[in-house]
């Protein structure tokens, strides 16, 4: 069965939640006997790969302009999928889903994965938000099957579009943690094991990393001994499009002694997750955050905003703070630093990528009927 995937910037080693999702899922689909081709956006690709872990990679041009790169690339990708003779076109995210009707007009079977209402993201203006809402509508109304990554999204599309048939709740997953140390890297960053708060995500407004930096600033102003003791805030990530927000965030971080790692993967990231005091995700918008699940898989104490997507993870009440309340966040971080270093045994059973791949395979097989 030939599957063609679009709606992602690409794999491997490309920043983003959808990208991480695809990087984990589709090699597993190949292992299950599917012929998978994933179409990448040229401006994010830094390699000349044509295949990765069995997934065929086709790279086609796209304009690196956030307002319309996804839609133009998806149009080209659908035409490519038709040429390749796809049995199923799997479209990710609501922006690319705007073209689900076009794919249906070409006679294709379409699976649409809804990763979250992206029109809630702070970075989009009115026109972009309108197009994203239209994309959500087109995907939910015309795709043969819809995969949602949380109950929040499942309830959303039932309420807005009455879509309940062939809607499949399949969570994001997380891989087994790779517990490791990396003394040379820690020396380079100037940090110590167990003495840093970790923020790990893209530098975009809705992640609210500026709130985390401000909470850290308040913390060290109240207790200057924390600096003497070596406690720091580490932000792991970057942005696809350097803009006023990301530049301002980096400046704010540097002024407050925050460690900026840039976009990292592999041993560097694993060592930061292994040894952090806690992980913090203060965002105002999420689908089902893979970064949070990844931190949980390492048994890390977490502090997250109380938005619906984070609440669905089902953490203890004390792990949440009111979204946007910097004082409350700062207070919680202070208590975590004062308490003994914790290892938390979370139940990660429903976030197993192999189980997820089996469930996605069931969706594909249903299209044969």
Regions found by a protein language model. Give the residues of each.
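Short hydrophobic beta-strand element within catalytic cores of glycosyltransferases
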Residues: 297, 301-304
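Nucleotide-activated donor-binding/catalytic signature segment of Leloir-type glycosyltransferases, i.e.
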Residues: 246-264
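Aromatic "clamp/platform" in nucleotide-sugar-dependent glycosyltransferases that forms part
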Residues: 284
């Amino acid at each position: 069965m030939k599957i063609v995937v679009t709606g992602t910037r690409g794999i491997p080693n490309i920043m983003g939640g959808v990208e991480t999702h695809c990087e984990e899922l589709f090699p597993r689909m190949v292992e299950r006997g599917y012929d998978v081709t994933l179409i990448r956006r040229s401006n994010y690709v830094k390699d000349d790969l044509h295949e990765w872990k069995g997934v065929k990679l086709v790279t086609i041009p796209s304009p690196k302009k956030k307002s319309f790169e996804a839609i133009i690339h998806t149009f080209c990708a659908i035409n490519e999928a038709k040429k390749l003779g796809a049995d199923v076109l799997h479209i990710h995210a609501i922006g690319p889903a705007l073209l689900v009707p076009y794919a249906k007009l070409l006679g294709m079977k379409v699976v649409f994965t809804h990763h979250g209402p992206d029109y809630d993201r702070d970075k989009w203006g009115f026109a972009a938000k309108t197009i994203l809402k239209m994309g959500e509508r087109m995907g939910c109304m015309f795709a043969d099957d819809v995969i949602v990554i949380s109950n929040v999204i499942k309830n959303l599309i039932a309420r807005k579009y009455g879509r309940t048939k062939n809607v499949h709740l399949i969570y994001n997953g997380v891989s087994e943690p790779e517990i490791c140390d990396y003394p040379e890297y820690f020396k380079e960053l100037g940090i110590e094991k167990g003495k840093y708060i970790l923020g790990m995500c893209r530098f975009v407004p809705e992640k609210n990393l500026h709130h985390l930096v401000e909470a850290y600033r308040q913390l060290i102003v109240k207790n200057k001994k924390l600096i003497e003791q070596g406690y720091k805030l580490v932000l792991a990530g970057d942005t696809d499009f350097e803009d006023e927000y990301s530049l301002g965030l980096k400046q704010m971080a540097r002024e407050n002694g925050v460690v900026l790692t840039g976009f990292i993967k592999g041993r560097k990231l694993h060592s930061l997750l292994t040894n952090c005091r806690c992980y913090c995700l203060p965002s105002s918008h999420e689908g089902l955050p893979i970064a949070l699940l990844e931190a949980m898989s390492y048994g890390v104490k977490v502090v997250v905003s109380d938005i619906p997507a984070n609440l669905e993870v089902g953490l203890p009440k004390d792990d949440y703070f009111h979204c946007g309340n910097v004082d409350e966040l700062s207070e919680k971080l202070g208590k975590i630093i004062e308490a003994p270093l914790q290892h938390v045994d979370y139940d990660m059973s429903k976030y197993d990528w192999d189980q997820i791949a089996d469930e996605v395979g069931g969706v594909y097989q249903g299209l044969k009927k």
